[in-house]
């Protein structure tokens, strides 16, 4: 064997033992002819000392990230020279011999000094990701991810779930984003699609009688690279038969609780639930951050008779910034720029003086009665600032929801180590297709309505009879789990009856012919005794990034893409050669379906 011990596991109890270590030169220091090296392996660092004149002379040539094999005797460090920051800080290894297993070229950035990480551009870090991952904080992120995988599997295995892999080459079916397409060389002009989720296959597994399925699944979505998204990502995918919403939520809480124990945090269960309508009304978001107690107050009725033109709108709402009246004018102007960057015209405000008097542009334009009652209506105290949004309900609530988050940051209301979880239930089943496209999503079908979650979500039982006649009122049998303002998982009770699924497609403008072409296999399966079933999928990259305290999911993915979907390490995506293009049949016209099927049958017969 190349080594007898691991660097980070040596302790005082090992004193006097002869050991052989392997690892990288983390740091080298010369002191009067004696050379000290911090030798790093996956477990940590051990200080190795080259005192012997022969080995010390050779050690002068060692540089950062050289790969070494050293043999020596473990000794307790002299009094006063211990390093409390290292697990092995009470000992050092006096080297008797060593071997250079490999040298290192000059580094593009320093690895041993973690404080320099912020000075290194992300493109450089990703281009040399194999070096970036030598830094303990990055390596530990991947180990945390592995531990989270294990914790989830332990919970699911204890409930008799079966881990099953579903295809990653399938047909293109509309699911809410654009597909990544893969040319099928043996069928020129035709394409596979990489799955956006295992949704349809996991439902088919329920029809197959597997009852309890899970998978740590790779998923692919060809979408614009908005904030902190990846074209390929991982989700913990779970599906089970003969369950209702409460069953799935209970299992989801057990999984999340076990995973959060990895960082020493005990989640109180059951996790509170909040309706989608309440979340939007109180927090302006369907993924509210509940670590701070700032709520939106609706003022539409309060200003119903106002003479102020700005407040003569579909919706008027407000949030209060405690102590905000003391903000200087430049800060209040900055709020206006902040709002404009979010597509609003501005952020109206009233300042409540310490004497209770109101000031600011809005205060001058509202009636005496409105001035007398507005502070009490929104719960503002002397010294506070009241911010308003007015306009259509959706965009106004979104602006106020963002404002409450910005207020929390400015007032330092979010404390490190705080966690707030909630379930969001009773979301709308459908939304206007125009709203979906405006937010950057793909509106499925050819109707003015599209699914909020996906086309396979069941309506709540009370809407089963009329969701297609009143799609705007129908609520979905769906549930999302939110942590600190991040949606970390979502699921639903699924449709398991063919006629209901066809009615949903019809609402979305998916014709019977199109449904049979793209989803015929699912509709056919529903005809053979499909059980009631439901499930949930957790965004695994997001969960691990939250656990590790990372700002970006890229930090918890071994080889992530940059913000533009580029891999700086391999320079993917890349052009292909004309020969590859020809072989892949990218430009070929697909044969008529009947002809292609006949050829396939002929080939199959020939093989037999």
UniProtKB/Swiss-Prot annotation:
It catalyses: tRNA(Asx) + L-aspartate + ATP = L-aspartyl-tRNA(Asx) + AMP + diphosphate. The keyword Ubl conjugation does not apply. GO terms for cellular component: cytoplasm. Residues 580-596 have a biased composition (Basic and acidic residues). InterPro entries: Aa-tRNA-synt_II (IPR004364), aa-tRNA-synth_II (IPR006195), aa-tRNA-synth_II/BPL/LPL (IPR045864), Asp-tRNA-ligase_1 (IPR004524), Asp-tRNA-ligase_1_N (IPR047089), Asp/Asn-tRNA-synth_IIb (IPR002312), AspRS_core (IPR047090), GAD-like_sf (IPR004115). It holds the Pfam family tRNA_anti-codon. Its main location: cytoplasm. Its EC number is 6.1.1.23. It is found in: Cytoplasm. Residues 199-202 are annotated as: Aspartate. GO terms for biological process: aspartyl-tRNA aminoacylation. Keywords: Aminoacyl-tRNA synthetase, ATP-binding, Cytoplasm, Ligase, Nucleotide-binding, Protein biosynthesis. CDD domains: AspRS_core (cd00777), EcAspRS_like_N (cd04317). L-aspartate binds at residues 175, 221, 453, 494. GO terms for molecular function: aspartate-tRNA ligase activity; aspartate-tRNA(Asn) ligase activity; ATP binding; nucleic acid binding. Residues 566-608 are annotated as: Disordered. ATP binds at residues 221-223, 230, 487, 539-542. The record marks 31, 80 as: Important for tRNA non-discrimination. PANTHER family: ASPARTATE--TRNA LIGASE, MITOCHONDRIAL, ASPARTYL/LYSYL-TRNA SYNTHETASE. Homodimer. Belongs to the class-II aminoacyl-tRNA synthetase family. Type 1 subfamily. Aspartyl-tRNA synthetase with relaxed tRNA specificity since it is able to aspartylate not only its cognate tRNA(Asp) but also tRNA(Asn). Reaction proceeds in two steps: L-aspartate is first activated by ATP to form Asp-AMP and then transferred to the acceptor end of tRNA(Asp/Asn). This is Aspartate--tRNA(Asp/Asn) ligase. It comes from Corynebacterium glutamicum (strain ATCC 13032 / DSM 20300 / JCM 1318 / BCRC 11384 / CCUG 27702 / LMG 3730 / NBRC 12168 / NCIMB 10025 / NRRL B-2784 / 534). The lineage of its organism: Bacteria, Bacillati, Actinomycetota, Actinomycetes, Mycobacteriales. The gene is aspS.
């Amino acid at each position: 064997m190349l080594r007898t011990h691991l660097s980070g596991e040596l302790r005082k109890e090992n004193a006097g033992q002869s050991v052989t270590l392997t690892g990288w030169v983390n740091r080298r220091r010369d002191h009067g002819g004696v050379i000290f090296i911090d030798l790093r392996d996956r477990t940590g660092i051990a200080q190795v000392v080259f005192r012997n004149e022969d080995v010390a002379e050779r050690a002068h040539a060692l540089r950062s990230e050289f790969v070494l094999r050293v043999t020596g005797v473990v000794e307790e460090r002299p009094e006063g020279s211990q390093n409390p920051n290292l697990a092995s800080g009470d000992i050092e290894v006096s080297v008797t011999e060593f071997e250079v297993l490999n040298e290192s070229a000059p580094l593009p950035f320093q690895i041993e000094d973690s404080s320099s990480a912020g000075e290194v551009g992300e493109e450089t870090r990703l281009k040399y990701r194999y070096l970036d991952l030598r830094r303990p904080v990055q390596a530990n992120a991947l180990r945390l991810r592995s531990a989270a995988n294990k914790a989830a599997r332990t919970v699911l295995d204890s409930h008799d779930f079966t881990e099953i892999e579903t295809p990653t080459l399938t047909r293109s079916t509309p699911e809410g984003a654009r597909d990544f397409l893969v040319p099928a060389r043996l069928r020129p002009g035709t394409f596979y699609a990489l799955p956006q989720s295992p949704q349809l296959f996991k439902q088919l597994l329920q029809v197959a009688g597997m009852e309890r399925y899970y998978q740590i699944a790779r998923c692919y979505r060809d979408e614009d690279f908005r904030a902190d998204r990846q074209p390929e990502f991982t989700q913990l995918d779970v599906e089970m038969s003969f369950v209702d919403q409460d069953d799935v939520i209970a299992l989801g809480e057990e999984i999340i609780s076990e995973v959060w124990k990895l960082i020493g945090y005990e989640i109180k269960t059951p996790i509170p639930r909040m309706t989608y309508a309440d979340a939007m009304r109180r927090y302006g978001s369907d993924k509210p951050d509940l670590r701070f107690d700032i709520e939106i107050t609706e003022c539409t009725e309060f200003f119903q008779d106002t003479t102020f033109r700005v407040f003569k709108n579909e919706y008027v709402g407000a949030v209060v910034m405690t102590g905000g009246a003391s903000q200087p004018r430049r800060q209040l102007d900055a709020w206006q720029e902040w709002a404009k960057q979010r597509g609003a015209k501005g952020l109206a405000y009233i300042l409540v003086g310490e004497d209770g008097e109101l000031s600011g542009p809005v205060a001058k334009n509202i009636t005496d009665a409105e001035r007398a009652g507005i502070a009490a209506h929104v719960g503002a105290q002397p010294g506070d600032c009241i911010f308003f949004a007015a306009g259509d309900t959706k965009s106004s609530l979104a602006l106020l929801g963002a404002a409450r988050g910005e207020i929390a940051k400015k007032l330092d209301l979010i404390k490190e180590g705080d966690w707030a979880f909630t379930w969001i239930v009773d979301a709308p089943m459908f939304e206007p297709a125009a709203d979906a496209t405006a937010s950057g999503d793909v509106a499925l079908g050819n109707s003015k309505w599209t699914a909020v979650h996906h086309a396979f979500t069941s309506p709540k039982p009370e809407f089963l009879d009329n969701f297609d006649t009143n799609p705007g009122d129908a609520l979905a049998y769906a549930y999302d789990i939110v942590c600190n303002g991040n949606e970390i998982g979502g699921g639903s009770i699924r449709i398991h009856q063919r006629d209901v699924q066809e009615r949903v497609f019809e609402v979305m403008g998916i014709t019977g012919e199109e449904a049979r072409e793209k989803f015929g296999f699912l509709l056919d399966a529903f005809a053979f005794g499909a059980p009631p079933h439901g499930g949930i999928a957790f965004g695994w990259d997001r969960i691990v990034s939250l656990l590790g305290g990372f700002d970006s999911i890229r930090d918890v993915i071994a080889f992530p893409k940059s913000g533009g979907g580029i891999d700086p390490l391999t320079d993917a995506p890349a052009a292909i050669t004309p020969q590859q293009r020809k072989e892949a049949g990218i430009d070929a016209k697909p044969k008529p379906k009947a002809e292609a099927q006949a050829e396939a049958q002929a080939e199959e017969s020939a093989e037999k």
